[in-house]
């Protein structure tokens, strides 16, 4: 086993050039969401690759029901919601290990990039900071490099390195590259697990960073707010009702609610830390959050706008229910309406998903902790996040013990301009994944 481990690790180190080329291929396929186009194209690339390893490969498009639950019309989604599934069958088929990464990316900002966001450029240095795992392998740039296409590559080459050594497992390995994680994952991993397409005994969620072992994440609910005004000539605005002005009042109230109520609503998770960048700003427990993400309204400066709409993300802590969150959210807006008789509004839930907490004491988690130390030479802390990942579907719906980690840190600038991934981190990630494959599935 030790000899096999060294062969696998050497294979990954020796094939960095191929790893980079494959990630470049994925980065150059535009899968930003919204709208979420080209999922089927990227799934085909994954299918071609995994067919080389003797996997059973399939592409599943989510059904109409899941499209509606995703917020299809509200978010302006387009194209099939394609999901890739590969099965590397073992001798006995037990246990079953499922690993997942997502193929969609955050939207690409129109300005502020110093590199082509779909270019996959490679440099030796990172001006935003170096990865602690940087051994001189360089950085690859583009939207999705670290979130989450680098992880798609890591799980791919972890299997390739084992396949090239002729490895066959006792158990079955299921690998999924799924869509729409950035908007809730309803038509992605949610669809695959809730429809019974993916069932497993253990899970790995490749999403996050290499700063720790992720065991918890918060739930989230996405709201759409609309204000309704009365259009009029902009030179006589007193005769109209300005929908943007009304939305501005709502936003003042929402920000007060976030800072004075939600941020104080914190919950400690025993044995689980928050990422250092949150602790640095005074948040050492998971906290309820709120973000006003988009706002649209008006047609021109000379017309009083009669419509305005915005999307708001409400991050939930364990114990909060969707009904509680919705009722409290609406009560904030009702408080504004009580002071403004002209305020007319609508609130709609785009989609929602619950958070999750894995116990640090679970045997699987303790085994994984040892694998991280074996590969990286040091123990990593158990982390919780104020974000949300598709791991909730594995834990809550699939009933799989699971953990998450991935590629990147603050220097990787996920969701920001100039996103990148450390090539050495992708290799380290792949080593960890390969060892989990070996240890949990067993060598036949």
What are these regions, as identified by a protein language model?
Residues 68, 80-84, 94-173, 423:
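Active-site metal-coordination/substrate-binding segment of hydrolases
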Residues 11, 371, 375-443:
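Zn-dependent metallopeptidase/amidohydrolase metal-coordination segment
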Residues 205, 209-212, 292-298, 385-402:
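Short glycine-rich, acidic/polar surface loops and turns
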Residues 7, 11, 21-25, 29, ...:
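Generic non-transmembrane alpha-helical segments
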Residues 200, 234-295, 302-304, 318-344:
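Acidic-enriched catalytic cores of C-N bond-cleaving enzymes acting on peptides and small amides
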Residues 2-110, 307-311, 325-328, 425-428:
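N-terminal helical capping/dimerization or prosegment-like subdomains
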Residues 139-216, 273, 279-283, 441-444:
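Acidic/histidine-rich catalytic neighborhood of metal-dependent amide-processing enzymes
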Residues 251-259, 272-277, 354-402:
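Active-site-adjacent substrate-binding region
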């Amino acid at each position: 086993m030790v000899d096999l481990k060294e062969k696998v690790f050497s294979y990954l180190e020796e094939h960095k050039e191929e790893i980079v080329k494959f990630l470049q291929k994925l980065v150059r396929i535009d899968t930003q969401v919204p709208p979420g186009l080209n999922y089927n194209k990227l799934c085909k690339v994954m299918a071609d690759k995994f067919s080389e390893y003797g996997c059973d490969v399939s592409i599943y498009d989510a059904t109409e029901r899941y499209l509606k639950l995703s917020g299809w019309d509200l978010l302006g989604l387009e194209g099939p919601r394609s999901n890739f599934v590969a099965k590397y069958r073992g001798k006995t088929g037990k246990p079953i290990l499922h690993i997942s990464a997502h193929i969609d990316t955050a939207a690409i900002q129109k300005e502020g990039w110093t590199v082509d966001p779909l270019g996959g450029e490679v440099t030796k240095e990172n001006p935003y900071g170096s990865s602690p795992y940087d051994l001189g392998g360089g950085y690859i740039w583009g939207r999705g490099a670290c979130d989450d296409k680098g992880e798609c590559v890591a799980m791919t080459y972890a299997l390739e390195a084992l396949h090239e050594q002729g490895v066959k497992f006792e158990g079955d390995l299921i690998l999924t590259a799924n869509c729409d994680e950035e908007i809730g994952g309803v038509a992605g991993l949610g669809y695959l697990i809730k429809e019974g397409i993916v069932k497993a005994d253990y899970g790995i969620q490749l999403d996050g960073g290499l700063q720790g072992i992720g065991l918890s994440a918060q739930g989230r609910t996405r709201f759409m707010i609309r204000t309704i005004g009365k259009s009029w000539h902009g030179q006589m605005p007193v005769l109209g009702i300005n929908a943007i002005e009304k939305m501005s009042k709502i936003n003042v109230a929402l920000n007060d609610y976030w800072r004075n109520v939600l941020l104080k609503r914190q919950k400690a998770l025993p044995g689980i830390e928050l990422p250092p960048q949150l602790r640095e700003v005074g948040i050492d427990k998971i906290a309820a959050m709120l973000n006003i993400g988009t706002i649209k309204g008006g047609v021109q400066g000379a017309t009083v706008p009669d419509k305005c709409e915005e999307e708001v993300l409400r991050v939930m802590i364990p114990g909060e229910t969707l009904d509680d969150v919705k009722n409290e959210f609406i009560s904030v807006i009702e408080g504004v309406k009580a002071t403004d008789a002209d305020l007319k509004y609508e609130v709609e839930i785009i989609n929602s998903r619950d958070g999750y907490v894995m116990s640090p004491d679970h045997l699987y988690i303790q085994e994984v902790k040892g694998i991280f130390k074996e590969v990286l030479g040091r123990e990593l802390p158990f982390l919780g996040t104020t974000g949300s990942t598709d791991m909730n579907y594995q834990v809550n719906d699939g009933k799989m013990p699971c953990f998450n980690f991935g590629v990147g840190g603050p220097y990787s600038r996920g969701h920001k301009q100039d996103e990148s991934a450390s090539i050495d981190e992708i290799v380290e990630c792949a080593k960890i994944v390969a060892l989990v494959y070996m240890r949990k599935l067993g060598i036949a």
